[in-house]
């Protein structure tokens, strides 16, 4: 039964998968890369974004140490929802699409940070935040 509320839909799907004895593919497995590729291809098609990836390429570029290269923590799966540590595919130059050479695996949190600002803005906010924390700790 489809729901218009994404949270209700996600909960319904999670319960169905548990009831049916199915689970999300483990990070780093062939099924994980195939599933990721399939979802990205559908997203690209629906949003008219260029796409030329395959599951083998996604596996080849996945960090061998299973860690986010930007924030350096180990990738993890959420229980039915994406979490900050979930592996996500980032388009380095968004308007180039999901094409070989323009994507990288990073955590959901790193992807959110990078998609919302320019590199200079990310550094500026980071420096400001660091100053705020240092002042608070000194007080």
Regions found by a protein language model. Give the residues of each.
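Short linker/helix segments within small regulatory modules
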Residues: 58, 83-88, 92-102
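Zinc-coordinating Cys/His ligand positions in small cysteine/histidine-rich zinc-finger domains
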Residues: 106-107
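Phosphate/NTP-binding elements of NTP-utilizing enzymes
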Residues: 110
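Low-complexity, polar-biased intrinsically disordered regions enriched in Pro/Ser/Thr/Gly
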Residues: 77-83
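Contiguous alpha-helical segments
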Residues: 1-69, 73, 77, 99, ...
